[in-house]
Amino acid sequence: MAEEEPSSVSRDLQELQRKLGLLLESFQNNSKVVAFMKSPVGRFLDRHPFLVLTVLMFVTMSAIPVGFFLLIVVLTSLGALMGAILLEGLVISVCGLSLLCILCGLGFVSLALSGITMMSYVVVSCLMSYWFSPSRPPTQQHANIDSQLAMKFTESEKLGL
């Protein structure tokens, strides 16, 4: 049994080598591959197989980390964009409500000041018209003052002043 295993393994390896050779030959006989290998880039790659293998391995191994990085960048950008929109909406809403409260307060203050000013104007104008009206009936106090002034005037006339 031990002798049967190496012969079957060697047969399997030979079969695998034959299949890989056919696959490689089909790639090399492909018209697109032939056209690429005749280009300057293809000739450079044919002259530097180690560099090609290194670049191919680097690109293959870095595809997953670069993909994750780009995914994180896109998700972070979308999150920041949504966050900025939400933050901007929140700031605008808070500022708008603050402005509304301030304007309502200023409206009430201006209404109160207008009312006080109008009441003051009415009271002062009524008092002014009452005090300085020529047709106003004399009050007792004003009558006493007027009579005292008249008496002083008549006394000064009597004395000849």
From Swiss-Prot:
Pfam families: Promethin
Listed InterPro entries: LDAF1
Lumenal-side positions: 62-67, 111-116
Keyword Mitochondrion assigned: no
Segments traversing the membrane: 44-61, 68-87, 94-110, 117-133
Gene Ontology cellular-component annotations: endoplasmic reticulum membrane; lipid droplet
Gene Ontology annotations of biological process type: lipid droplet formation
Disulfide bonds: none
Membrane topology designation: Multi-pass membrane protein
Stretches in topological domain Cytoplasmic: 1-43, 88-93, 134-161
Keywords, alphabetical: Endoplasmic reticulum, Lipid droplet, Membrane, Transmembrane, Transmembrane helix
Subcellular location: Endoplasmic reticulum membrane; Lipid droplet
Record function comment: Plays an important role in the formation of lipid droplets (LD) which are storage organelles at the center of lipid and energy homeostasis. In association with BSCL2/seipin, defines the sites of LD formation in the endoplasmic reticulum.
Subunit structure: Interacts with BSCL2/seipin to form an oligomeric complex.
Family listed: Belongs to the LDAF1 family.
Protein name listed in UniProt: Lipid droplet assembly factor 1
Lineage: Eukaryota, Metazoa, Chordata, Craniata, Vertebrata
